[in-house]
Regions:
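Aromatic-anchored glycine-rich loop motif in surface-exposed flexible loops
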Residues: 1-54, 69-89
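An aromatic- and glycine-enriched ligand-binding surface/loop that stacks and positions planar moieties
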Residues: 36, 56, 62, 66-177
Length: 177
């Protein structure tokens, strides 16, 4: 997507100005090599603390890199390993801190009604982590808006909607090929 860039495989301890550009394919091949190593050596998702990538996240990214390298069978194999991982599953039941959430509603008549569904649970602040029961998430950002310093403490005053701020800006990307 971005064209040529250097591949640096050794730690740089002093200023360097003689970098050699690598092609996109060389970069993707290095990513593949690194991710194959990661799949082998990173912890299983159930043995990893929240917010840290596991071998499931490495497999997911590897499947995308293999698509870029036009190795579609390899991509299917890696994606299938993620899908069939016994620790992963699509959420089909309410979970987390808000599974029993009730809402009085705008026309409150004295009885609270259950509110939300599984999809709603997936994206609620402080509710989407594996520790909360979310087995669908491959890797997520850890933050807690109810904890002092646990969310956005920038100049905007601490309104942390991170899960709504990031996303693919596909309309602004240009393929160089």
């Amino acid at each position: 997507m971005w064209g040529k860039a250097p591949i640096v495989l050794e730690e740089t301890t002093s200023p360097q100005f003689n970098y050699q550009s690598a092609t996109q394919e060389e970069i993707y091949k290095q990513c593949k090599e690194d991710l194959l190593f990661a799949v082998q050596w990173m912890p299983e998702i159930d043995n990893q603390k929240g917010g840290r990538a596991s071998n499931v996240a490495a497999r997911h990214l590897l499947s995308e890199i293999l698509i870029c390298l036009k190795d579609y069978n390899g991509a299917v194999e890696q994606a299938t390993a993620v899908i069939n991982n016994p620790s992963m599953s699509l959420m089909t039941e309410r979970f987390g801190k808000l599974k029993d959430f009730t809402f009085e509603g705008y026309d409150y008549q004295g009885e609270k009604e259950p509110w939300g569904d599984v999809y709603w649970d997936l994206f609620r602040e402080n509710n989407f982590n594996r520790i909360d029961g979310n087995k669908e998430c491959i890797w997520n950002v850890q933050f807690d808006v109810e904890l002092q310093g646990g969310g956005n403490t920038g100049v905007s005053g601490g309104n942390f909607g991170l899960e709504r701020w990031f996303g693919a800006a596909w309309w602004s990307q240009k393929d160089l090929d």
